[in-house]
């Protein structure tokens, strides 16, 4: 088993980027397994071993690699054409320093120029420690989808001082945002999307989905309300406080029952009803008074009629004045009943003196 110390000896004294990554033995082991499983490696005769094994032999793993660094781009997959390590000034040590300590991002390419150019004499790129075997398998599956994608380039040999077309002169640059890790076909512009992913629907698709959602929401609204009503759990009522489980819960005290209040009437209607009641009372009193008046009139008329009849009878009667009291003594009881005492002075004054007739 190769340890980070032994591997650093064999690589010829490469300087690690960060001492914290020396403990990641498992990740370096994965990178070695990936390298051994790749039979397409070829070495260039003129390049020193340190340059050829620059991407593999570094035992360090940066804790947080910038999104645009070639290490992250190498770990993205075998077919990833996004980043290339820049060629050095001419010495192997300079190339090692550029590859290990100063990772640089690649410049923005025009849509006409491919992302990177393949080189038949170069070896297949290695998987970095940060991605591992899972990232390599994912990259291989994506590479099968796009067979025409160019391979990642390694640093050129020290004898070639000229950079490749599309590359930038070495120098520290700020890291760019994370780029797409899926392969691109050569000649495909930067703005195009991958073939493995479906193209975005755009406004038309989103609008259509929103329209479908709006149409479906109106139809599902009553159904959702019904479901909510049906889903409400039936909570059983507990034992009454009094302990009477047979107690009828519908029965309540009269004070607890809700009583309907009488309908409120307007002020005008109240005054109208009061006036009507007053008129009814007045009319009833008037009727009683009228009835009493008629009764009194009838009584008075009756009395007057009786008095007038008596007077008429007296006027029409024939009387005999008894001037001899001895006759009264000899008269019988039956005769005495018909005899009356009356005041005859008024009659004598009104009428001329007549000869009185004796009653038999």
UniProtKB/Swiss-Prot annotation:
Localization in the cell: Nucleus; Chromosome; Nucleus, Nucleolus
UniProt cross-references to InterPro entries, sorted A to Z: CCDC86, Cgr1-like
Modified residues (Phosphothreonine): 65
GO cellular component annotations of the record: nucleolus
Disordered: annotated span: 1-314, 328-360
Record flagged with keyword Coiled coil: yes
Superkingdom field: Eukaryota
Name assigned to this protein: Coiled-coil domain-containing protein 86
């Amino acid at each position: 088993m190769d340890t980070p110390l032994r591997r650093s000896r064999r690589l010829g004294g490469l300087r690690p980027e960060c001492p914290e990554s020396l403990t990641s033995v498992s990740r370096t082991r994965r990178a070695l397994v990936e390298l051994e499983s790749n039979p397409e490696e070829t070495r260039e005769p003129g390049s020193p071993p340190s340059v050829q094994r620059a991407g593999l032999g570094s035992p360090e793993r940066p804790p947080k690699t910038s999104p645009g660094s070639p290490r992250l781009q190498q770990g993205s997959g075998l077919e990833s054409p996004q980043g290339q390590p820049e060629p050095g000034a001419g010495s192997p040590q300079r190339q090692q320093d550029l590859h290990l300590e100063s990772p640089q991002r690649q410049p923005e390419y025009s849509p006409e120029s491919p992302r990177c150019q393949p080189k038949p004499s170069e070896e297949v790129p290695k998987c970095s420690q940060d991605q591992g075997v899972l990232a390599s398998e994912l990259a291989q599956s994506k590479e099968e989808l796009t067979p025409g994608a160019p391979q990642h380039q390694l640093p050129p040999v020290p004898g070639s001082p000229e950079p490749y077309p599309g590359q930038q002169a070495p120098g520290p640059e700020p890291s760019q945002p994370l780029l797409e890790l899926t392969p691109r076909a050569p000649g495909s512009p930067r703005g195009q999307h991958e073939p493995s992913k479906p193209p975005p629907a755009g406004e038309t698709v989103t609008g259509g989905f929103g329209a479908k959602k709006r149409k479906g929401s109106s139809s599902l609204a009553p159904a959702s309300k019904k479901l909510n009503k049906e889903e409400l759990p039936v909570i059983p009522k507990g034992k009454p406080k009094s302990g009477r489980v047979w107690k009828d819960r519908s029965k309540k005290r009269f004070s607890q029952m809700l009583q309907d209040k009488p309908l409120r009437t307007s002020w005008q209607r109240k005054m109208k009803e009061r006036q009507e009641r007053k008129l009814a009372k007045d009319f009833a009193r008037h009727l009683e008074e009228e009835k009493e008046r008629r009764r009194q009139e009838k009584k008075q008329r009756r009395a007057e009629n009786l008095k007038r009849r008596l007077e008429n009878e007296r006027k029409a009667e024939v009387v005999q004045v008894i001037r001899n009291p001895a006759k009264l003594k000899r008269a019988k009881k039956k005769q005495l009943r018909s005899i009356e005492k009356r005041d005859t002075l008024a009659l004598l004054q009104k009428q001329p003196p007549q000869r009185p007739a004796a009653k038999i």
